[in-house]
């Protein structure tokens, strides 16, 4: 596996039509190897349909901890919550790491661009991350969710500006915003300014209102929006005591829907090309005419002819934000000699 950060394609897409597939499916909770095998089956199926781009939901690897307690409460600390976090941390993956190697292999073997939602562990801090892979079996890089939502902030760290890539590829300019990051106008604007054409939106939001957000972003950004959400039943989660839901979910029957999906593909002209699917696990596939990007931007280009930088201007800090910086003795000596 090799990595490539923001590698420019420096050209137009090799074809004006790109077939893209969204995978709407549930994580195999507390079992990352089984989740990877499930991902493999869906990737193979999508590739057999001629798809060049495959997008998975938020936190597909590692799992979205819907309904988890983690013992949280203001001023509350308990052993049950700590042990829940221990198990959740064990399901997360290192980036890079063996699971990333496996995903790169799957992308290369099936000749697809792959966008995978994963829970990344960096030491003992977790991040909600989107991973990008090329048909050549390369790990292109990652985007860490900038702002976890609500109680997600108690279990996930915040990404920084160093991981907001848009990759210039033969099938279009590819990037991602995760779940409610899509409600952050300034982050969307940063992606638009990087020329995003294939706007991937891995999410855990299966609400009807989410569809309105996706439609707006497609029109606002003049880009294709590919929103992937998990479809989960209560029986997809472990039973007590291995998985402890909040009371509302505890009342549900095994076949009751816990996450209803709603995955959808929308064109830059605001046309729903596939989905939304609120019924089951499965694939959602559409052919994307990249010429629609130019057609849409005739009338509206939010970071071009329809912008007013003399009045409104955005500055994006892409420097990594680390809590500790170590300066070696050699670097310190060189720094002292320059004073």
Swiss-Prot record:
CDD domains according to UniProt: nitrilases_CHs (cd07564)
Entries under SUPFAM superfamilies matching the protein: Carbon-nitrogen hydrolase
Enzyme class: hydrolase
Keyword Hydrolase appears in the UniProt entry: yes
Domain CN hydrolase, residue spans: 18-290
Residues bearing PTM N-acetylserine: 2
Membrane topology: Peripheral membrane protein
Family affiliation: Belongs to the carbon-nitrogen hydrolase superfamily. Nitrilase family.
Function: Can convert indole-3-acetonitrile to the plant hormone indole-3-acetic acid.
Protein name: Nitrilase 2
């Amino acid at each position: 596996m090799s990595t490539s950060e923001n590698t420019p394609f420096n050209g137009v897409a090799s074809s004006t039509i790109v077939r893209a597939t969204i995978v709407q499916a549930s994580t195999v909770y507390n079992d990352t190897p089984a989740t990877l095998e499930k991902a493999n089956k869906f990737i193979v199926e999508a590739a057999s349909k001629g798809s060049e781009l495959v997008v998975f939901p938020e936190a597909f690897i590692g799992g979205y901890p819907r309904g988890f307690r983690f013992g949280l409460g203001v001023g509350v600390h308990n052993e049950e919550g700590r042990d829940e976090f221990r198990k959740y941390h064990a399901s997360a993956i290192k980036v890079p790491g063996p699971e990333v190697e496996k995903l790169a292999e799957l992308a290369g073997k099936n000749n697809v661009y792959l966008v995978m939602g994963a829970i990344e562990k960096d030491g003992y801090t977790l991040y909600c991350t989107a991973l990008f892979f090329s048909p050549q079996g390369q790990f292109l890089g990652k985007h860490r969710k900038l702002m976890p939502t609500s109680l997600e902030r108690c279990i996930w760290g915040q990404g920084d500006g160093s991981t907001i890539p848009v990759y210039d590829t033969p099938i279009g300019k590819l990037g991602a915003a995760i779940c409610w990051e899509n409600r952050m106008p300034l982050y969307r604007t940063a992606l638009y300014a990087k020329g995003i054409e294939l706007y991937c939106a891995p999410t855990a939001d299966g609400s009807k209102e989410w569809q309105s957000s996706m439609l707006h972003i497609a029109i606002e950004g003049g880009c294709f929006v590919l929103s992937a959400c998990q479809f989960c039943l209560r029986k997809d989660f472990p039973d007590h005591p291995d998985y402890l839901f909040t009371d509302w979910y505890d009342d549900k029957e095994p076949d009751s829907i816990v996450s209803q999906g709603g995955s959808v593909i929308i064109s830059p002209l605001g046309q729903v090309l596939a989905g939304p699917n609120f019924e089951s696990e499965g694939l959602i596939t559409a052919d994307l005419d990249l010429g629609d990007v130019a057609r849409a931007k005739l009338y509206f280009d939010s970071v071009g002819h329809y912008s007013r930088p003399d009045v409104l201007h955005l500055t994006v800090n892409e420097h990594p934000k680390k809590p500790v910086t170590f300066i070696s003795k050699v670097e310190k000596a060189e720094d002292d000699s320059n004073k």
